[in-house]
Amino acid sequence: MNPNKKIYISDVTLRDGSHAIRHQYSVENAVQIARALDKAKVDSIEVAHGDGLQGSSFNYGFGAHTDLEWIEAVADTVKHAKVATLLLPGIGTVHDLKAAYSAGARIVRVATHCTEADVSRQHIEVARNLGMEAVGFLMMSHMTTPQALAEQAKLMESYGATCCYVVDSGGALSMNDVRDRFRAFKEVLKPETETGIHAHHNLSLGVANSIVAVEEGCDRVDASLSGMGAGAGNAPLEVFIAAADRMGWNHGCNLYTLMDAADDIVRPLQDRPVRVDRETLALGYAGVYSSFLRHSEVAAKKYGLKAVDILVELGRRRMVGGQEDMIVDVALDLLKGHEHDAEHAIPTMSEAG
């Protein structure tokens, strides 16, 4: 890698971080966080419901505000950073993309499952026609091979994406997994096409994986204040910047401003600690979509189950983002299995009298 190359810092506190508090950021929260990030000189700030434009729904959870309210508030606040947003084809539409652009978004990350890049074409093309920066975002990147993932990135590039991401939605990639995926990208993408890493911290590898990605030539790094994000969170922004600083990398951010924002503004908003614990570790171990965490915990409480059991079964069934409705199905199947086991249990001597 070129140590003098400027690493593009993409903050996701106001989008992925929304998962951690069930999409309940107030507009005031968004403005305060955006102001701090802008002061710290991050390059972009992603803003949306955790599941992207129009994610606010019964299936994913309703947001405290609309995407446009958040985007407009942040766009009116920042002076340095570009406003980005996320769109999942099938949830967000071209109409929503145009509205986000009008509200102030200038970058869109079009997100698909890692084997379904073909559904991104319309949205990437429309984004480019609007004058937006279009980024391809390949979620659950651990679920396919490095070479197959690279071919999907090549499709997004052909549609007009100027940057393609390895997205570790489950926080399941090891450092060698990340290295192999970026090397595969390098083999097939044009030299001018940038690459990005979106890490989750479920195996405590969020920062390490981001560092490996940069060592392999990755241009953009996603991170969030105090790791605010789904599951055990994303790569903590202030930690990545501190590590990058120690390595002499050019990132352009003010570390102490980020440290203050993480501890004084973001961490107090968490109603469930964003950390590696029994449940979030299960996400990374089983390779489960990180935003399934809060939904699974609700289902576990409702049906008297362990959230870990639900998460591991979701991983076994290879469920992916967008299948949140299956969490209740899995819980009911597990409950039925427990009831069957109890009904057919062999009585002990004391129970038999």
From Swiss-Prot:
PROSITE patterns: PYR_CT. Mn(2+) binds at residues 16, 198, 200. The active site is at 19 (proton acceptor). Keywords: Aromatic hydrocarbons catabolism, Lyase, Manganese, Metal-binding. Its EC number is 4.1.3.39. Belongs to the 4-hydroxy-2-oxovalerate aldolase family. This is 4-hydroxy-2-oxovalerate aldolase 3. It comes from Dechloromonas aromatica (strain RCB).
